[in-house]
Amino acid sequence: MEPETEGPPPTIPVTPLQQMIASCTGAVLTSLMVTPLDVVKIRLQAQNNPFPKGKCFLYSNGLMDHMCVCEEESKKAWYKKPGNFRGTLDAFLKILRNEGIKSLWSGLPPTLVMAIPATVIYFTCYEQLSAFLKTKLGENETRIPIVAGVVARFGAVTVISPLELIRTKVQSKKFSYKELYQFVSMRVSEDGWISLWKGWAPTILRDVPFSAMYWYNYENLKRWLCEKSGLYEPTFMINFTSGALSGSFAAVATLPFDVVKTQKQTQLWTNEYCKFPAPLDMSTWTIMKNIVADKGFSGLFTGLIPRLVKIVPACAIMISSYELGKSFFQKQNVESR
């Protein structure tokens, strides 16, 4: 009689609601841990080049980028507080010592209104699409992460894009609900519904390829590390490492589109706020050619290190905490079976 070989432990798939809870928890943890890096970066930028009224800057909570408009000429705004910082570490310590620990999360709550729903939609759609495609194509089909990642990101960006435009408008003008309704109605009547998706195209060009590369590399790297370790299920460190490496590769590969997206959206909102006449809307490829002509090919990779510093920990924390949440619910499902 042959000895029985131990197989993988029984698992029950997590429900969509459980996936939503896991992704929401991961989103909150990611934003709490990554936001201080961007707050320090923005404070240093504001110190070296003070933001004039109407100036736009990017704020990242680790989940998504948000366009913010400097609307206050006084020094009351969190990004205009004086600090006399000598560098990143000095800024971090002085903010902590002089302003309190809460200042490291300045500006976070309003951005989470968009970021958490976007993350929940994205991760839940990815999981549901992956499960569906596996039933049709098989468990080991390598194209599944690419297809699911592309469709999930496309959907999340499309849903959130008009809401983010409205959020930015409210933040820049302090509109009442009635004025906001009038703004949306006027915009739709003048330029059609498509005007609510301004800035959508460059975001899609950056985020969709990022998502495809990220999920493809993450799933394959996670599987490879499990095989090398002789494990059926990935550990927290395997998920963390796979997320960090996959995020860094995707961040480098899509950086040119990030440079273009930042330039287009900053110009768009500066014109909106200051009522400048709208310039000729250049395509992504035209902007890229102009950047190469002005700064050389390296201009397309401006800000590589800051992007990696932000993206790598965000990807690692988000995916590892999300997978941890899924593992918790899987155990609960098995026990309650």
UniProtKB/Swiss-Prot annotation:
Molecular functions (GO terms): glutathione transmembrane transporter activity
Task performed by this protein: Probable mitochondrial transporter required for glutathione import into mitochondria. Glutathione, which plays key roles in oxidative metabolism, is produced exclusively in the cytosol and is imported in many organelles. Mitochondrial glutathione is required for the activity and stability of proteins containing iron-sulfur clusters, as well as erythropoiesis.
Catalytic activity field: glutathione(in) = glutathione(out)
GO BP term, example: erythrocyte development
First and last residues of every Solcar repeat: 14-132, 140-224, 234-328
Locations listed in the record: Mitochondrion inner membrane
Presence of keyword Transcription: no
Disruption phenotype: Cells lacking both Slc25a39 and Slc25a40 show defects in the activity and stability of proteins containing iron-sulfur clusters.
Transmembrane segments annotated in the record for this chain: 20-40, 104-124, 146-166, 200-221, 240-260, 299-319
Keyword Transmembrane helix: yes
Family as reported in the entry's similarity comment: Belongs to the mitochondrial carrier (TC 2.A.29) family.
Location, primary (coarse class): mitochondrion
Organism: Mus musculus
Lipid bilayer topology: Multi-pass membrane protein
GO CC annotation terms, alphabetical: mitochondrial inner membrane; mitochondrion
Alphabetical keyword list: Membrane, Mitochondrion, Mitochondrion inner membrane, Repeat, Transmembrane, Transmembrane helix, Transport
Name of the protein in question: Mitochondrial glutathione transporter SLC25A40
